[in-house]
Amino acid sequence: MLFRSHQYPRVQPCVITVITRGEDEILLAKNARNTRSNMYGLIAGFVEVGETLEEAVRRETLEEVGIQVKNVQYLASQPWPFPSNLMIAFKAEYASGELCLQEEEISDAQFFKFDQLPEIPFKGSIAHAMIMHATEGTTVADDTREWL
């Protein structure tokens, strides 16, 4: 008798968060491992076993830049097929704390005025769409592929 077992793909959930402060500031961070570019992006990281997505947003933000966030809300998701990641996008608001960088992950992080953004991720990435949503009020589509 032959038993067939199903192989389910292993997907690694990652949270990525756009954090605003007040009506006109956005937190952007520079990845310490990206030494060839002056590009700033968003806070992101893997979800740990037993953790909710919202808890992952709060933990990653506290670990990487030392601040607390509030009003964490889901925005969208984007598959990254190599290496099997699913980027799950959230927006949050600054709650408290001073920026204190996890230097092995983040080389710089600042709150930028919406009209004074540094170099940001390319159009077509979920990070770019999230930054535009926060700074220019672009809508989030029901289908993430339309939003990007």
Language model features: what each stretch is:
Residues 42-76, 90, 98:
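The catalytic Nudix box helix
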Residues 78-101:
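Active-site-adjacent beta-strand/loop module that shapes the phosphate/pyrophosphate-binding cleft
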Residues 15-19:
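Short beta-strand scaffold segments in enzyme catalytic cores
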